[in-house]
Curated annotation (Swiss-Prot):
Residues the record lists as Phosphothreonine modifications: T271
Function text: DNA repair protein involved in DNA non-homologous end joining (NHEJ); it is required for double-strand break (DSB) repair and V(D)J recombination and is also involved in telomere maintenance. Plays a key role in NHEJ by promoting the ligation of various mismatched and non-cohesive ends. Together with PAXX, collaborates with DNA polymerase lambda (POLL) to promote joining of non-cohesive DNA ends. May act in concert with XRCC5-XRCC6 (Ku) to stimulate XRCC4-mediated joining of blunt ends and several types of mismatched ends that are non-complementary or partially complementary.
Residue ranges, compositional bias (Basic residues): 293-304
GO cellular component: DNA ligase IV complex; DNA-dependent protein kinase-DNA ligase 4 complex; nonhomologous end joining complex; nucleus; site of double-strand break
Phylogenetic classification of the source organism: Eukaryota, Metazoa, Chordata, Craniata, Vertebrata
Family: Belongs to the XRCC4-XLF family. XLF subfamily.
Entry keyword DNA repair: yes
Organism: Rattus norvegicus
Subunit comment: Homodimer; mainly exists as a homodimer when not associated with XRCC4. Interacts with XRCC4; the interaction is direct and is mediated via a head-to-head interaction between N-terminal head regions. Component of the core long-range non-homologous end joining (NHEJ) complex (also named DNA-PK complex) composed of PRKDC, LIG4, XRCC4, XRCC6/Ku70, XRCC5/Ku86 and NHEJ1/XLF. Additional component of the NHEJ complex includes PAXX.
Bias (Low complexity): 241-257
Domain of life: Eukaryota
Compartment(s): Nucleus; Chromosome
Keywords: Chromosome, Coiled coil, DNA damage, DNA repair, DNA-binding, Nucleus, Phosphoprotein
Name under which the protein is recorded: Non-homologous end-joining factor 1
Amino acid sequence: MEELEQGLLMQPWAWLQLAENSLLAKASITKHGYALLISDLQQVWHEQVDTLEVSQRAKELNKRLTAPPAAFLHHLDEVLRPLFKDSAHQDAAHPSKATFSCDRGEEVLILRVRSELSGLPFNWHFHCLPASSLLVSQHLICPLMGVSLALHSHVRELAALLRMKDLEIQAYQESGAVLSRGRLKTEPFEENSFLEQFMVEKLPEACAVGDGRPFAMNLQSLYVAVTKQQVQARQKHKGSGEPQTSSSTSPQGTDSQLQNQPEQQISPTPTLSEPECEPMAASGPVHRAQLVKAKRKKPRGLFS
């Protein structure tokens, strides 16, 4: 079942519009079974079954159909995959070959699927129970924290690029260059003012979750990239036998790494441990001169 769990983690969330409501869902289907996660933005639901359960449920729901579990799983994959793949572009012009309905009880969410298999009606019921806190953490909390940190880093890179562009424009102006089209003139980028304006004017619209569709439409590729990175980091630490404290998989580790980076960058001189300092102090003026020379050759930042 590890293949199913990892496959589910690597899938993006898809937006499903049903007659009753809309859902976010992700699924992983193999010849050994399937795993499904569903969320209505209030609760997360989960089901994972093997071939034995698939065979038993297929007999209960489709008495006229006889086929191996792999055939039913393949059909479910064919039914769900296009729906998930094109979730961002669902419209009346591209109706699904299957119909979906959803019933929610106190402790279970049932997603019903009606389709055709070999010319005969095929029904399937996904019986999803409330997901464990571990699953919610693996599929939502940790990936979304990773997405947030990635977007933050992206913004920082763009801000640095804008400052470089402003310096380039200033150099052109100082050399006598003049814009031929005044409408292209821009003011130098001021990050704090930009952030304040964004918080006031753009934030309410930008963070509107709605029914989850904007998230499924705009962040699928980044979500998958983040989860892939986290899976690879876990596999690396599992193979090495080390405790999982890497900054790539731990939000605290990532935050600590970001906090430590500026300290490393502004350090004026290399630090030496005591065993290394003592022989240098006792080695005479030649070694001291070499140390001074090394300090003079220390590279400086571009705008230092």
